[in-house]
């Protein structure tokens, strides 16, 4: 056995259909595409979602929902994070600038304070864009002050 004498096993290689090589080949003329119509033309490819003239699924189903253009997104900050910030900095006023300096929020973020974490006592004024009802209650009960921005 030599490399130049190697052949594939019998029946393992299928001969390809030679289409459009004259009428004598058996596959000439219309080249297995039938007569006329879009599918017989060169460059034809079916449209994605085309269902043969039936109204396609993406057009049968209704549109729904929208995204409001003027939605205000708040960055949630929890009380336990604020307590850590107070311990770390020792500040008596916690505002957005201080939160930004310590990496809690971005420069243009609006802040909403949420009530996760236990609060024993807060001797600080917390300034934010919004507070949850339970967070503002927890802060005032612990001796802190709540101030809303605009």
Swiss-Prot record:
Region of interest called Disordered, as start-end residue ranges on this chain: 1-51
Keyword presence, RNA-binding: yes
Comp. bias (Gly residues): 21-31
Keywords: Ribonucleoprotein, Ribosomal protein, RNA-binding, rRNA-binding
Domain of life of the organism encoding this protein: Bacteria
Pfam annotation, one family: Ribosomal_L27A
RNA-binding among keywords: yes
InterPro entries registered for this protein in UniProt: Ribosomal_uL15 (IPR030878), Ribosomal_uL15/eL18 (IPR021131), Ribosomal_uL15/eL18_sf (IPR036227), Ribosomal_uL15_bac-type (IPR005749)
GO MF, one annotated term: structural constituent of ribosome
One Gene Ontology biological process: translation
GO CC terms: cytosolic large ribosomal subunit
Subunit record text: Part of the 50S ribosomal subunit.
Entry function: Binds to the 23S rRNA.
Sequence similarity: Belongs to the universal ribosomal protein uL15 family.
Protein name (record): Large ribosomal subunit protein uL15
Organism: Cytophaga hutchinsonii (strain ATCC 33406 / DSM 1761 / CIP 103989 / NBRC 15051 / NCIMB 9469 / D465)
């Amino acid at each position: 056995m030599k490399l130049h004498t190697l052949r594939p096993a019998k029946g393992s290689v299928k001969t390809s259909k030679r289409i459009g090589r004259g009428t004598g080949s058996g596959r000439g003329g219309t080249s297995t595409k039938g007569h006329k119509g879009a599918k017989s033309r060169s460059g034809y490819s079916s449209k994605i979602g085309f269902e043969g003239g039936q109204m396609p699924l993406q057009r049968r189903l209704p549109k729904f929902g929208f995204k409001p253009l003027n939605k205000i997104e708040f960055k949630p900050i929890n009380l336990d994070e604020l307590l850590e910030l107070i311990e770390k900095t020792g500040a008596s006023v916690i505002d957005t600038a201080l939160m930004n300096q310590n990496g809690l929020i971005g420069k243009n973020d609006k802040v909403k304070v949420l009530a996760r974490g236990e609060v024993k006592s807060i001797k600080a004024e917390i300034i934010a864009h919004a507070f949850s009802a339970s967070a503002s209650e927890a802060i005032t009960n612990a001796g802190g002050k709540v101030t809303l921005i605009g």
